[in-house]
Amino acid sequence: MYQDLIRNELNEAAETLANFLKDDANIHAIQRAAVLLADSFKGGGKVLSCGNGGSHCDAMHFAEELTGRYRENRPGYPAIAISDVSHISCVGNDFGFNDIFSRYVEAVGREGDVLLGISTSGNSANVIKAIAAAREKGMKVITLTGKDGGKMAGTADIEIRVPHFGYADRIQEIHIKVIHILIQLIEKEMVK
């Protein structure tokens, strides 16, 4: 009954991944991001991650797998997803939704830390403000974006962009794969 729809969805996902893989810059950016994150951890730094909606879930998933574990047991790594409901509701109410991530970065970010900002469109105003706050703190910035990178294009030390212009879920599917690869590479870098 829905077999054609299922095949079409899986084929589109495979095509999106194939297009992402065609650009060697993406592979190099993932490797550079993993090394940057591991170097931050080795130097006593941490990663703060943020995003909205599904990207927020990806930010939490990234932090959880760093503080917990991925595939193998190992020490936890310092990662915080900006997801505290009381913080988000307080800042959202008192300052505005666009400030929910930047206020947190201002409060706990420091030089040597890394911000991972995730936005499928690259146009999330609150993530863009978090990037600006991270820069003011002397932090490094990694972004996961989609489409043409939106307003976030060119704002990061390392941008990993999924050049897909359809629905956001295809971009999110690549983002979560990139997140898993980053964790795998970080684990390898941490034991060097």
Swiss-Prot record:
Main location: cytoplasm
EC number(s) per entry: 5.3.1.28
Record keywords, A-Z: Carbohydrate metabolism, Cytoplasm, Isomerase, Metal-binding, Zinc
GO cellular component annotations of the record: cytoplasm
Subcellular location: Cytoplasm
Domain SIS: from-to ranges: 37-192
InterPro entries in the record: GmhA/DiaA, Phosphoheptose_Isoase, SIS_dom, SIS_dom_sf, SIS_GmhA/DiaA_subfam
Named cofactor requirement(s): Zn(2+)
Keyword Signal: no
Binding site for substrate: 52-54, 65, 93-94, 119-121, 124, 172
Any one GO molecular function term: zinc ion binding
Other noteworthy facts: The reaction produces a racemic mixture of D-glycero-alpha-D-manno-heptose 7-phosphate and D-glycero-beta-D-manno-heptose 7-phosphate.
Family: Belongs to the SIS family. GmhA subfamily.
Assembly notes: Homotetramer.
HAMAP family for this protein: GmhA
Protein name in the entry: Phosphoheptose isomerase
Gene: gmhA
